[in-house]
Structure formats: structure tokens, C-alpha cells
């Protein structure tokens, strides 16, 4: 499949086509795995099954990649997660975008891999070359907000030093998928929430902030539950 981006290189921008043949979403990617296990137990208390091991990796249908500003979902219990996204052309050429692993939390309690397929993988239409941010990678900041009933709720925030670096993430994916990672999209997994639990709102917004180069990638989309037919979903 082909995705279209604007590649921002220093102060220049140019159109870029990115061909990809597979997409994966990582999870539980904290560099401190003791803290990750605490988070796993919190999720278990909410009814979400514990993974057999961490970090985790899930295959995702390529067609779910989306830059849409509006998504339709089934039911009211879906929410986004801010993540960095690696676009791997080959081992020498990798780009970074910003994404949201939007997930059906009702289905997640039953079947996590299938929960990853039912909602889109949102992504920015702008990307950066990885080599332009690699040296100061840990200083980059992920943030997200949920807009619920007209109120903006600060939802997530954390420096990228908290989760696996691109090199660590690619090494992890290589340990699960044999062969080169050419034409692969990797969603990184996310940072912690500032709220006590999931917030199900009408809009999700996120930023990847580069304080050194004074720039950011920004993502925002509206969430519309299907309402024209009642099928008994929560």
C-alpha cells in the first residue's frame, strides 16, 4: 500500500510517498519494565487480560492506517493513545510520524489483537527524517488531550526517554519478525495517562514536541459513534 506524507527536513518540506506492506503496534514499552508490570496489574483490575510477556507486539491490517480528521466507531467506549510511529523504508532510511492507536476498550477486555483491527491507526500527514532527531531523541515530548462535552482534558504527557527508543523498538520487532523490516510501519506504544482511567470523548488531539528544533507534529480527529442503529453496544 502507498501512504502520502509531507516530509519536513530542517526548514524545507517536500511530498513523500511511502510504500508499506505490514504494520505492527507495540505495547507495554516502558524502559522500566518493573513499572510496566505495575501498569499491567492495574489493567487486570479493570478486566483487561494480562499479556504473556512484555513488551507486546500485534499485527494490524494495513488498510486501517488513516490521516482522516473524523473517524466512525462502534459504541462509546473507544479512545486514542499518543504514540510515535516509525516508517521504515529500509535499514538506512527511517522516518518518524505521530500517531494514535485508537482502540475499542470494550473489545480489548475480550480480545486485544482483534481490538487493534476495529478502529483506525491514525497518523499525521507530516513526517520527519529519524536522523534529524535521533541525537536528542529522549528530549522529545508526547502529549495528548481528550475533548469531552466541550471540556479539554489533559490526558497524557511524557518524554520519550520513558519508552523504548527507535533502535530498541526496531530490535524488539526484529526479534518477533524474521528478515529485514523494509516497508514496515511500527506504532511505538504509549506513555502513561494523567487521568485515573480511560476518557471517552468526542475528539482526540496529540503532539510530538521537539524543544531543541522548536517544532512539533500535531494530530487531531473527531470521534463519532455510529448512532443510526442500536445493536446493543456500550
Language model features with spans:
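Catalytic-core "active-site belt" of small-molecule-metabolizing enzymes
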Residues: 1-179, 185, 192-234
Amino acid at each position: 500500500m502507498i501512504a502520502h506524507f509531507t516530509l519536513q527536513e530542517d526548514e524545507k518540506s517536500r511530498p513523500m510517498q511511502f510504500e508499506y506492506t505490514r504494520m505492527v503496534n507495540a505495547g507495554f514499552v516502558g524502559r522500566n519494565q518493573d513499572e510496566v508490570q505495575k501498569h499491567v496489574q492495574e489493567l487486570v483490575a479493570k478486566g483487561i487480560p494480562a499479556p504473556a510477556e512484555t513488551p507486546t507486539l500485534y499485527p494490524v491490517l494495513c488498510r486501517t492506517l488513516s490521516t482522516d480528521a473524523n473517524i466512525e466507531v462502534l459504541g462509546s467506549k473507544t479512545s486514542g493513545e499518543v504514540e510515535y510511529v516509525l516508517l521504515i523504508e529500509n535499514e538506512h532510511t527511517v522516518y518518524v510520524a505521530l500517531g494514535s492507536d485508537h482502540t475499542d476498550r470494550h473489545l480489548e477486555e475480550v480480545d486485544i489483537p482483534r481490538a487493534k483491527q476495529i478502529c483506525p491507526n491514525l497518523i499525521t500527514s507530516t513526517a520527519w527524517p529519524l536522523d534529524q532527531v535521533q541525537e536528542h531523541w529522549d528530549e522529545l515530548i508526547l502529549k495528548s488531550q481528550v475533548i469531552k462535552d466541550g471540556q479539554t482534558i489533559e490526558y497524557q504527557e511524557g518524554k520519550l526517554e520513558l519508552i523504548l527508543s527507535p533502535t530498541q523498538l526496531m530490535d524488539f520487532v526484529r526479534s518477533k519478525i524474521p528478515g529485514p523490516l523494509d516497508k514496515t510501519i511500527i506504532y511505538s506504544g504509549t506513555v502513561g495517562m494523567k487521568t485515573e482511567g480511560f476518557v471517552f470523548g468526542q475528539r482526540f488531539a496529540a503532539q510530538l514536541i521537539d524543544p531543541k528544533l522548536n517544532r512539533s507534529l500535531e494530530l487531531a480527529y473527531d470521534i463519532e459513534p455510529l448512532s443510526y442503529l442500536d445493536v446493543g453496544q456500550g
